[in-house]
């Protein structure tokens, strides 16, 4: 109402007399006419005020970007500088909030109001040079006892292992070997055989093909797929040909599933992706009904998508650049992080993937998310963390860690474990926020509010 009165006052000053009181000198203009004109102006002002309020609310809605587009902003929390690469989550203490597991430690979630993430050791992990024996972690109930266990694999350590959840605090988790394997750098969780139970697939099985592990039975069952020519740096799972079956994606082509449980696959050497990251993602980028690919150069510069064109014998692929500004794009993830109902692409730079020998090893660390225009196939980049301490190691975890309704991001790497808190919904108290911000001085700053003497511009004659 106060805004309406101000609007009417301004209108009285700005509208010409002809509009407010009739034509000058026309004394026959009735009082009723004046009242009607004034009422019309009042309605216009109210509508303008309500429109302005509506626009203001749209602009100030948390997570709202320019033009009303959904946009997410993140604050980075460095939980520790411990050697880490793989990362997963589970509720370790039963408080209803997911905790972060990475390497030998788990980090206790402080809850909805924020605070310190306390570190606890729950297992032992070996380190060779600067490589930790933990290039990937997945929470899976391996022994079907109702408690999630942790499955891991690594580049320089023999085997794929699972760590048994003792369901008791303060007890070290027992280590079990699933299979003998070297150079198992990364993997992907997906339901490969369509039984409704997530499986794991790994690249670099003794340089002689891939393995996928079925966890539906009493004991994990290991399946071997392909040979050395089909294997490589990177792996993914997607239905390439639209037959409803999960196919396997490698840097050298794809394995069409005929019957996964019986080991029947057809090889299609359709592409060469060099050292792709994990995972190679299958996604219909331009919404044309065909499965496209998204991949990053794990040890060089570049983030790309391959457009699938044609089908059957005429199927071919066209590479299109998404972003070539940063290197070591070793981990990717599709997830809705801005709350618009559509998945965004998460990508970031890994630190010292090859001991500092990769191109751009010491470029600034970055993590971005990309909105995908499904009509044109265009990608728009938004920052998550730029030139900070957070980089993308070998995995992204996207989950509502603080239970406030938006999706947060967790990463681990050689610069430590990071919780990237989504501020689209922020329920952390002001007092806690101020503890987290870098500024720790009292207000006002020394000298604040004092008059500052204006210096004369250069060349001014001295008095």
What role is predicted for each listed range?
Residues 39-51:
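Bacterial N-terminal signal peptides
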Residues 29-40:
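Bacterial N-terminal signal peptides that target proteins for export
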Residues 3, 22-25:
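Residue-identity detector for glycine
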Residues 6-7, 12, 45:
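Cysteine-centered motifs
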Residues 1, 10, 19-20:
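Methionine residue identity
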Residues 52-463:
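Beta-propeller-forming repeat regions
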